[in-house]
């Protein structure tokens, strides 16, 4: 016995007169009195079937619950001209039912209609994800996900990379986010951790002599959700290369990313090499280390200029400005002011350049006449330009200017939605100051400092740059990477500056530190996020749209009821007791 001879997307005019079998879900039922039409759906498409004129057939078919699973056998016939559906691949034909069998009857009320253009609460969608995934949109997302991963794998293998699976149960290590911990039954009081990334393992593979490694790696981080970040787990194209420089990594991964986006999207994409932007320049020019280069607006630093003025809100402040090549309506300025206030800004000053090159706006009276020409020159202002001003401390001014730049780009419809703009952010600072003025690592502590040991010994730590890099696309960070610090002596000194002792390194990174004392090759790597790539390829507003069974924003799996309580017996086996804390 076979449930089907064809999928619901394969029946065509070539099959007219043939007996076929299909199986799928009942999407719609149309009872026209003497005849009943049903649309049968599987993951490939939809085929229309129609009953014979027999009363018992009509009665049976009309009472099948929508979304039940059925098997239909019948003869393919050509549709009448007036019933042809050009929207369906099978729209020229239909199946005249000889037998229809309900394989799985829906016995519960649907929490929402599948494949209908309606707004459904996310908690319902996630609780009944098995129904949500029946929708054409999510099915197509999963099909695309499978194809993208297969293509990534083919490219990496074709480029000489070896696929290696690394452990899922490992030790806890301080890599930035919180670990998911797994208690050991055998070793009382001890815990495994799910890996935040295969970072140490892939570096150990380089020490092992594996020249070029990759895997589609699951990563686990106990962190808060964002639109582009799902709590719990995510997947990345993890890769590492021995005897590699920063440029070697760029040359290896750029074609992979370019080819993938070109193959699975019709949007425009600039050919590699992708632009390189220094971190400091990115913060100044775009207000972020994840710039959306589709937005042509950029930020100007006017801090030095405004030291000459007496405008109180700008005194002793970092002042950033954004220029727009047009005058804007009063309503536009009011909306931008509302947005600025929502960010915590006291206001949003601006000036408009008139035809005679005079300046007009809320703050023009605070700029001396003799300095206005200087402002026009410094900001390269032209007739009909509008320039916005943001003032705060240096860090906050950059953040706010970046947000204002993004909002202006959206409101003025300057962003080309039909393109992907990639860029490398390079030359990250090795260290930064915490709120308590202590020096800490800015990003990846395993990165090689530019200048090596000499830089660590002679430079101000806050001026040392690292061989760290991010690849960003349309304002989304796809991945971070780095040239690794493979020299134990340089590693000890680098960690010492951040307040760690050699003993700390030996305890927290014992395997890696020990391995590096056995002749480690220089190595570098990166790990583009698969979920984020798919989010961009599908234009999804939330990363959960490209994951089969995601958690909600509270790190809950509403369908499976996770996290959940376990029995006292299970806890006892693990030598764990739960106590209430005040």
Residue ranges of predicted features:
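Class II aminoacyl-tRNA synthetase catalytic cores and aaRS-like
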Residues: 1-582
């Amino acid at each position: 016995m076979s449930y089907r001879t064809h999928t619901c997307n394969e029946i065509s005019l070539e099959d007219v007169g043939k007996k076929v079998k299909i199986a799928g879900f009942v999407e719609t039922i149309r009872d026209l009195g003497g005849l009943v039409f049903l649309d049968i759906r599987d993951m490939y498409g939809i085929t229309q079937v129609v009953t014979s004129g027999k009363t018992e057939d009509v009665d049976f078919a009309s009472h099948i619950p929508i979304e039940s699973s059925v098997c239909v056998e019948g003869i393919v016939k050509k549709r009448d001209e007036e019933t042809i559906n050009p929207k369906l691949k099978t729209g020229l034909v239909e199946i005249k039912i000889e037998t229809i069998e309900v394989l799985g009857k829906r016995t519960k009320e649907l929490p929402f209609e599948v494949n209908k253009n309606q707004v459904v609460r996310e908690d319902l969608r996630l609780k009944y994800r098995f129904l949500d995934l029946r929708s054409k949109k999510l099915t197509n997302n999963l099909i695309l996900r499978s194809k993208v991963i297969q293509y990534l794998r083919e490219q990496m293998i074709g480029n000489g990379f070896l696929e290696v699976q690394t452990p899922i149960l490992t030790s806890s290590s301080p890599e930035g986010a919180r670990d998911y911990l797994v208690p050991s039954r055998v070793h009382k009081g001890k815990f495994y951790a799910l890996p935040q990334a295969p970072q140490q393992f892939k570096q150990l593979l380089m020490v092992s002599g594996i020249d070029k490694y990759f895997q589609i790696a699951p990563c686990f981080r106990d962190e808060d959700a964002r639109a582009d970040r799902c709590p719990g787990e995510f997947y990345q194209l993890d890769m590492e290369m021995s005897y590699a420089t920063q440029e070697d990594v760029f040359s290896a991964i750029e074609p992979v990313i370019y080819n993938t986006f070109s193959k699975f999207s019709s949007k425009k994409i600039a050919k590699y090499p992708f632009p390189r932007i220094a971190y400091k320049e990115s913060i100044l020019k775009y207000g972020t280390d994840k710039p959306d280069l589709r937005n042509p607006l950029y930020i100007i630093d006017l801090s030095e200029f405004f030291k000459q003025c007496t405008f109180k809100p700008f005194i002793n402040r970092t002042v950033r400005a954004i220029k727009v090549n047009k005058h804007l309506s009063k309503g536009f300025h009011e909306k931008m002011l509302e947005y600025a206030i929502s960010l915590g800004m006291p206001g949003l000053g601006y000036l408009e350049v008139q035809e005679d090159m005079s300046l007009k706006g809320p703050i023009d009276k605070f700029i001396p006449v003799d300095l206005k020409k200087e402002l026009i020159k410094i900001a390269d202002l032209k007739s009909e330009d509008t320039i916005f001003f943001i003032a705060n401390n240096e860090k906050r001014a950059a953040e706010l200017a970046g947000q204002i730049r993004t909002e202006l780009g959206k409101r003025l419809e300057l962003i080309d939605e039909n393109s992907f703009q990639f860029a490398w952010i390079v030359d990250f600072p090795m260290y930064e100051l915490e709120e308590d003025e202590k020096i800490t690592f800015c990003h990846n502590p395993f990165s090689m400092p530019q200048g090596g040991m000499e830089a660590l010994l002679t430079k101000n730590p806050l001026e040392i740059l690292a061989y760290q890099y991010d690849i960003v696309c349309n304002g989304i960070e796809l991945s971070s990477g780095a040239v690794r610090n493979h020299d134990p002596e340089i590693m000890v000194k680098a960690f010492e500056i951040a307040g760690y002792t050699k003993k700390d390194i030996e305890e927290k990174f014992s395997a890696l530190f020990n391995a590096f004392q056995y002749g480690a090759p220089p190595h570098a790597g990166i790990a583009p996020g698969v979920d984020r790539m798919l989010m961009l390829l599908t234009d999804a507003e939330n990363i959960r749209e490209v994951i089969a069974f995601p958690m909600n924003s509270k790190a809950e799996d509403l369908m499976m009821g996770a996290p959940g309580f376990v029995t006292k017996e299970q806890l006892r086996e693990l030598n764990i007791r739960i106590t209430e804390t005040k």
